[in-house]
Amino acid sequence: MSSFRWVRPLQLTLALIKPDAVANPVISEAVHQKILENNFLIIRHKELHWRSTDSQRFYCEHKGRFFYQRLVEFMSSGPMQAYILAHEDAVQLWRNLMGPTKVFRARIVAPGTVRGDLGLTDTRNTTHGSDSVESACREITFFFPEFNTSDWYEKQEPRYRTGPVFYDEERSEHRLEGE
């Protein structure tokens, strides 16, 4: 049982563990543990494997950029994990925990971050995270179409904020007591 008590409203963000990290169980577990150690609530979690068309749809804003094709192919190269995370400033906190996109820079200016410690290249940089609250809502819907963000904020957020909440190891998600 966890005694999470939050002062401010919780915010949701999407976190992806990319195929390079999921391919290595030690790295995948290390990222999962960093999420828990930084007191994120894991609202939803699933493993999935994209088709190339899924990757193209998700990264359509980057079409025409030099890295687009490499990114599309990489993101459909193997299984990945998707998380809906909650925290008071979830978007910014997850971005801080990930570190800079460019792995070489992350190693120098942000050691201790996921990308600084575990990233391989600028494409194989272990993680993705939403860059704004608006992006988070859009991206959560892309990966979890059955999840209603508005409904969660209205009905579930106050309950997760005040607890009690427990971590269900079998599902790798936090749950409200009694559910």
Swiss-Prot record:
PROSITE patterns: NDPK, NDPK_LIKE. Major role in the synthesis of nucleoside triphosphates other than ATP. The ATP gamma phosphate is transferred to the NDP beta phosphate via a ping-pong mechanism, using a phosphorylated active-site intermediate. This is Nucleoside diphosphate kinase 6. The gene is nme6. Belongs to the NDK family. The lineage of its organism: Eukaryota, Metazoa, Chordata, Craniata, Vertebrata. It catalyses: a 2'-deoxyribonucleoside 5'-diphosphate + ATP = a 2'-deoxyribonucleoside 5'-triphosphate + ADP; a ribonucleoside 5'-diphosphate + ATP = a ribonucleoside 5'-triphosphate + ADP. ATP binds at residues 18, 67, 95, 101, 115, 125. Its EC number is 2.7.4.6.
